[in-house]
Amino acid sequence: LIDYHSEKIKGTLAKGTIRNFQITENYVLKFLKSNKLEDIFLSRLDYKFICDFESFLVQYYPKGHPRAMSHNTVMKHIQRLRKMIRLAYHLEWLDKDPFRRWKTTFEKTDREFLSEHELSNLATYEFPLERLERVRDLFLFSCYTGISYADLNKLTPNNIWKGEDDKKWIVTNRQKTNTRVKVPLMPTALRLIEKYREHPLTEVSGTLFPPITNERANLYLKEIAEACGLTKNLTFHMARHTFATTVTLSNGMPIETVSKLLGHTKIATTQIYARVLDKKVEEDMNKLQEVLQSKSKTPKRPISNLKIIR
């Protein structure tokens, strides 16, 4: 089934989606191995198999990760397994669909982003090490364009186009979904491109920015956050979230436009950011209310030495 499914999705899904299926397939094989099995008959795939696979994922610590998978990550793997098993069911390789009574449940999570103040502090901080400055600049470019790390690392001068407005745009295809993305370049983003135009590493690689591995970039982001006094966990996902919230939606850009700039295939994905902003407004209003209430409770001091002049 795994081999058939892998062959079927070749060339039909984005590379990132295919890679995710491969990761799920590897976990299924590890789960079988943990039960001293190399393979299993499709007829033995039942509701208990799904429950046991879920338990295996919940307790499994992926290599190089400090903790087990989150609930939502586990659900994503089970979702992908369901697609494979339902394919077998529709091909009539299975008499019953083991997932007919299964319900995937996802926990609502807030997407962290940098506030305007945090973004400004990060942009103006002077780093003593060039490697940290470089990764900070990559992060900032993502904050001002919404371009993901995977796509950012591949950008070349050929991705810069001149629009009808005579302004420069980044035009690229998202690696994750293969969606065409066109993003107008703001002055900050243009300055960052210009900064690295003649950098020795970009001249060798032919890219807009000096290339760096994802692992190393994430390692340096931790140092950057510590140096800037940020308690938030800096990631390139957060940079995209910052573009969606602080840079665009907070400044009145329509959600449909933001969705297009981010390369989302569904506007529902972008609406998550709008809900995050609504929650922040609610929290800020609650804080303001607390301040106003504390002021109203403060006893007023009598004014001494007051004379009435007639």
Residues covered by each model-derived region:
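Catalytic-site neighborhood detector that most strongly recognizes the C-terminal catalytic loop/helix
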Residues: F113, R174-N178, N214, L262-K287
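Basic, Lys/Arg- and aromatic-enriched nucleic-acid-binding interface segment
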Residues: R67-H71, M75-Q79, H90-Y149, K167
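Short, polar N-cap/turn motifs at the start of nucleic acid-interacting alpha helices
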Residues: N159-D166, T231-K232, G252-I272, K279, ...
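C-terminal catalytic core of tyrosine-transesterase DNA break-rejoin enzymes
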Residues: L140, Y144-D151, E223, R240-T265, ...
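C-terminal catalytic core of Y-nucleophile DNA break-rejoin enzymes
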Residues: K108, Q175-E194, T202-E223
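C-terminal secondary-structure termini that scaffold catalytic or DNA-interacting sites
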Residues: H199-E203, L288-R310
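N-terminal DNA-binding recognition helix of tyrosine site-specific recombinases/integrases
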Residues: G16, Y27-S34, E38-I40, K48, ...
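Short, aromatic/basic-rich helix-turn unit that serves as a nucleic-acid recognition element
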Residues: L1-E25
